[in-house]
């Protein structure tokens, strides 16, 4: 399959910058699931070590979030990661094998702030949050939403667990 139309990169970007992420000699980055680039910092979510590395815009390691455990303020397994617009806190979906929760930490010090006990139980390839809504890219992964089986491309969920399925394919 070929693209019908090409868009020159110059139409969507005026420059490109490659930043080499540098870690301390005692650290190793493993399987990076996601790189999140914000105004102040670059975040690398390492799912093999269950750690989030934080880099400055020059690529130097600033700190890392490493609170895997079973105690208060610790996570069992890192799920999706959300960082607020001013980068004052970082939130991690804590996959526990049961009801997922969202742990909130103060950014850079990673002091534990609180836990939200509500996170939709949806299987997805990617999750983003914007203005209180969760956007799940489920891309044909089977889910049961609104009392129906679905494998649509996108599911949107609000803070009261109201769901909307977009591009429902119903592929068997």
Residue ranges and their predicted role:
Residues 44-48, 92-96, 136-139:
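Conserved beta-strand positions in repeat-built beta-propeller and related beta-rich domains
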Residues 101-108, 149-161:
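Beta-propeller blade signature
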Residues 1-18:
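Blade/loop signatures of beta-propeller domains
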Residues 22-27, 31, 60-96, 118-120:
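Blade-loop segments of beta-propeller domains
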Residues 37-39, 83-86, 129-131:
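Residue-level detector of Asp-centered blade-edge/turn motifs that repeat once per structural unit
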Residues 9-10, 44-66:
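Beta-propeller domains
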Residues 16-20, 61-69, 112-119, 163-171:
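Beta-propeller fold detector
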Residues 47-48, 95-99, 144-151:
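Short, solvent-exposed loop/turn segments at conserved positions within beta-propeller repeat blades
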